[in-house]
Amino acid sequence: MMASLFSVFDPTSSFLSNWLSMLIPLLFMVMSFWLIPSRPQFLAKSVLMGLNREMSLLMGPASFGANILVIALFLFILFNNFIGLFPYIFTATSHLAVTLSLAVPLWISFILYTWIKETTNALAHLVPLGTPAPLMPFMVLMEIISNMIRPITLSVRLAANMIAGHLLLTLLGAQGTLENLYVTSIVVFSQIILLMLEFSVAIIQSYVFMTLMTLYASE
């Protein structure tokens, strides 16, 4: 029996630091340079080109470098979400230490770039159009607080969704018993369905993280 339901999220074990699982996607990326392009690779390239076009619509045609950055972030989160669904592999994106380290630096860089390059627009964005003069200080304070909590909500959303799915899988797995074949069959079938949903959640959350970060940058 598990000592704790959250023991599956422990970052270390007696064998090896589980944080090294974050490097597994790099192995697949390096191997792809020496492999003959296959149909899955062409499909992945088509998806990435579609994401690049979508990011260009949100951030402008002159944002090619920023597009590469957010798409690389999307791939990193997606790979870590996927490998975390396999048995005995640590889910790095279920920890705020990882999600915050991805969201906060990008958010700070976007904020600094905006305030340095477009100071007037940044100041105007703090006060919505048509705000009465007595409410302007309050609106400025609210806008500052809203901007400051954006990376936190972005990180918590990703980590919470990853934790919720893994907890459900763990709870279902703990209900199966070898003595009752009927109950075990139901549990296994339920886990398969839930695992398929978790793969969908992994894709959706990676896309949401990338899209919201792009929208924050475009503002």
Curated annotation (Swiss-Prot):
Q: Which InterPro entries match?
A: ATP_synth_F0_asu (IPR000568), ATP_synth_F0_asu_AS (IPR023011), ATP_synth_F0_asu_bact/mt (IPR045083), F0_ATP_A_sf (IPR035908)
Q: Which UniProt keywords apply?
A: ATP synthesis, CF(0), Hydrogen ion transport, Ion transport, Membrane, Mitochondrion, Mitochondrion inner membrane, Transmembrane, Transmembrane helix, Transport
Gene Ontology CC annotation, any one: proton-transporting ATP synthase complex
Q: Where are the transmembrane segments?
A: 16-36, 57-79, 96-116, 122-142, 158-178, 184-204
- The question of whether Ion transport is a record keyword is answered with yes
Q: How does it sit in the membrane?
A: Multi-pass membrane protein
PROSITE patterns attached to this UniProt entry: ATPASE_A
A family per Pfam: ATP-synt_A
- Taxonomic superkingdom: Eukaryota
Q: Where in the cell is it found?
A: Mitochondrion inner membrane
**What are this entry's molecular-function GO terms?**
proton-transporting ATP synthase activity, rotational mechanism
Name where it mostly resides. mitochondrion
Question: Which family is annotated?
Answer: Belongs to the ATPase A chain family.
Please name the PANTHER family in this protein's record: ATP SYNTHASE SUBUNIT A (PTHR11410:SF0)
Quaternary structure, per UniProt, is: F-type ATPases have 2 components, CF(1) - the catalytic core - and CF(0) - the membrane proton channel. CF(1) has five subunits: alpha(3), beta(3), gamma(1), delta(1), epsilon(1). CF(0) has three main subunits: a, b and c.
Please describe what this protein does.
Mitochondrial membrane ATP synthase (F(1)F(0) ATP synthase or Complex V) produces ATP from ADP in the presence of a proton gradient across the membrane which is generated by electron transport complexes of the respiratory chain. F-type ATPases consist of two structural domains, F(1) - containing the extramembraneous catalytic core and F(0) - containing the membrane proton channel, linked together by a central stalk and a peripheral stalk. During catalysis, ATP synthesis in the catalytic domain of F(1) is coupled via a rotary mechanism of the central stalk subunits to proton translocation.
User: What is the name of the protein in this document?
Assistant: ATP synthase subunit a
Q: Which organism is it from?
A: Artemia franciscana (Brine shrimp)
Gene this protein is translated from: ATP6
